[in-house]
């Protein structure tokens, strides 16, 4: 019996030693398992990121992402509805018609009798056509004459307003527009000038046209930048850009106002560039939560609710308590925008919106507090930051003229994004200056309903005469300036 006890005691000691030895190993394995589980969750969450729950563009969505549910049909047939007034091309005023050709029937369609007379209101049919375009070539013969008194030879200079290069202002304007707004490569732009206008150009000539336009636009663009800084409401956004043969990543910035939009291309995405673009905190600024804008006074800042909606959707997809909080926030967001659309359409007074929003704001703040301790790390971090910025979620309710989203600035910068994707950015700093200036000019002129080619042509002509180029500012602001 004692021998059996001694064997059991020996086994117990061995097992105790083994447990003691394995306990740290087990603890280490448990810690490693927790780390790996957290890493897997992080990677799965990253794989689940798309344009609906982050700021990623829809073009980056994977094929596996299910499309949004189809909208419920109205039950009506496609096309114009009964009673709907049709749309058709408007006729050009008779004063702008180049040629009028009367067309009269010669005989009756029933009996064949000859027809005479005038129709006081004939049916008008207009056909627009572009005539064959041929470049107008002007040759300047600069004579060199010898003085009969001192034998000095004097060569004539080009008259004022004549460009020193081979191409005139309108050619420079059109080439610059093709390589910027229409995003053609230099070779394609040269081919377009040959096919459309019968004008042969080298790639070097295309680059020279860009350089001329960029230099002429420097003054008007600087004036537009100063104008934007002084505006009471502006939106801002930024996106990546490529510069140089190595495709170094730099940043394209935009500041949008009601009448003027300006762009900058800079190496940084930081606060210094934001201050250079926007000024010193004057007026209301509508942006996303990017840290470069945190210096702007919170009282005069509006967070973009389109971005907030995507954050709330990310809460839902995180699962657990974050899912319930995100769903509740999406319900509040939908209700808020139903009210906002009515204010925008004029069917709800802003004072009523302010009254409605009081209780909704309390509910949103309570949900964010719950989210800050929900147990999901990213949801907690986002909710804590939103609680710090919470006053900036409601500026559009308080002030007229402020949008709840920065969608206008995102639409403006989208043309730059497409340019970057098609042309791979710019090859030099000079190219970046050309890009930011042409983006500023084309966006601003289109906002104001002004012609881009005519503006560029007149500005280059003014520069050749030694005069200031035409202003980009709205007429009233330009007159003051």
List the predicted regions and their residue ranges:
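Short, flexible loop/hinge motifs at secondary-structure junctions
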Residues: 1-166, 235-236, 242, 287
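Catalytic center-proximal scaffold of phosphoryl-transfer enzymes
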Residues: 20, 35, 41, 88-91, ...
